[in-house]
Amino acid sequence: MITSLYQSLCNMETNIADRVALRWYDEEKQGVAEVHYAQYAQDLRRFVAFLRAEYGDVRGKRVAILARNSYQYVICMYGTVIAGAVAVPLNLGKDWDAISYELGLTEPVCILQDGEFAEREPALAETYGSILKPMDVFAAYEPAEDVTEVEDLSALAFIMFTSGTTGRSKGVMLSQKNLFSAMPAFLDPFDDVKKYTGWNTDEFSSLSALPMFHISAMTSLVSWSITGHSINLCNNLKYFYRDLGAMHSEVMAVVPVLLKSIYSDVMKGRRDRLNGLCVLTCGAAMFDPKILSDMMEKGFFVAQMYGLTETCGDGAWNSSQEAKYLTSVGHVDLSCEYKLDDGELCMRGNPIMLGYYKDPEGTAEVIDACLLYTSPSPRDPKTSR
């Protein structure tokens, strides 16, 4: 079982090197570009070489990423963690006030960016111009051949900012141990796909349309690289149908707004626009049971995923295709402990975050004796109220 990004890198080089790793629509070529896992691994090593050359010992140092989904984004995010640094993927859609707060909090050694945010918010270059780097900066370096496992897989590896619906976003601290402990929640549902449908999931490709700062996109990318499947990247929802049409994809992680669009096409007889899409993993909110039931009747396999950034996306999943079970949370992660406290779901286990970055009080509000309280409401940890 692969339990770290370094082990995943080695797997790319030794077992799945000749498989297609990622595809995307290349605007300049006006067509699809792709890389195999062998090239993916080499570019990860190049990124490690870049960090070492520019910043020396990067263990524990933060590297911010502010860009749209791209192949380079993937390399920057995972290369950072393989090098022992901390990846900080930021939400390109936020304003300067929010981004400047998050950059000030995390104090990155560099900000990898594609220019879009800087064009919209000139204050980025004015304030952080000396540490801005292009997303493809690693391409000029030779691959580092002496990459090894990080010393501690329980150490901080990612800072993922929450949506911030009740004030400033909180920086969720996640380790590689958190990430890989959650992998069964993303891999096991595909055993159910085989059982229910008989489809050969070994040949599936997945369209990644959610931004990489979203926990679902990040964890899905890791899980698919473990199994050696192909990931098709969509960097802008306005090009969703173009990209879906250009890159055949069986699987997609969806949030409610995406599901509604897909549902509309299916119910209006426009399923051909979906180019073979047949498996939907639904997360981020409760979904209308009627929509799910209708999609199943039309031949889709639908899995409902329940998790938080604070649980590395883990929690529970419902892969039943029977209408009477659509409102159930389904299976839980048997490696974790669950309990209800005054109607609130609590969870303890290896996928649970390390805490909120530089926010011990906020951490204490939701974690009591390693037990995560899933409600965002403040409470007294002594009384759990």
Predicted segments, located by residue:
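Conserved AMP-binding/adenylation subdomain of ANL enzymes
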Residues: 180-205, 212-251, 257-269, 276
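Conserved small/polar residues in nucleotide/adenosyl-binding loops
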Residues: 162, 373-380
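Conserved pre-ATP/AMP-binding loop-to-beta segment of ANL
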Residues: 18-20, 144-161, 167-168, 194-205
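Structural core segment of the AMP-binding/adenylate-forming
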Residues: 78, 82-143, 148-149
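Gly/Ser/Thr-rich phosphate-binding loop
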Residues: 250-254, 262-324, 337
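Conserved ANL (AMP-binding/adenylate-forming) active-site segment centered on the GW(Y/F)…HTG consensus within
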Residues: 323-326, 352-375
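Conserved AMP-binding/adenylate-forming
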Residues: 33, 48-94, 209
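Conserved AMP-binding A3 loop
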Residues: 34-38, 157-184, 385
